[in-house]
Amino acid sequence: MASIQDIQALEERIYDAVQEYLDNPDGYENAVLRVYLDEDDMIHRAEIDNNLQGTEDDGIYAIESLIREGDDGPEVDNDRASDIANSWIFLD
């Protein structure tokens, strides 16, 4: 049974992954965000991967789609992170 807390937890995982990328963009080559359900513990995960091919239907998101220009430079697009989390987890 999914809850709003599950959605918020995935939003935070997405935010953290994209922020990790923003903190060290040179550490990645062709970076994408990968969202998936870890079947071992049934928790949705979000991580940055290199050179991974796929579409949003596969859980692969262009990193640029999660970054917006803020007052102090590039930052995580929280609205986009929320949209992605809500597309993965549905409330019962």
Question: Language-model features: where?
Answer:
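Short acidic DE-rich linear segments
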Residues: I89-D92
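Negatively charged, low-complexity tracts enriched in Asp/Glu with abundant Ser/Thr
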Residues: A2-D26
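Polar low-complexity intrinsically disordered regions
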Residues: M1-Q5, E69-D72
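Charged/polar, solvent-exposed surface patches and flexible loops
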Residues: E12, D16, E20, S65, ...
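Acidic, low-complexity, intrinsically disordered interaction modules
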Residues: P25-I84
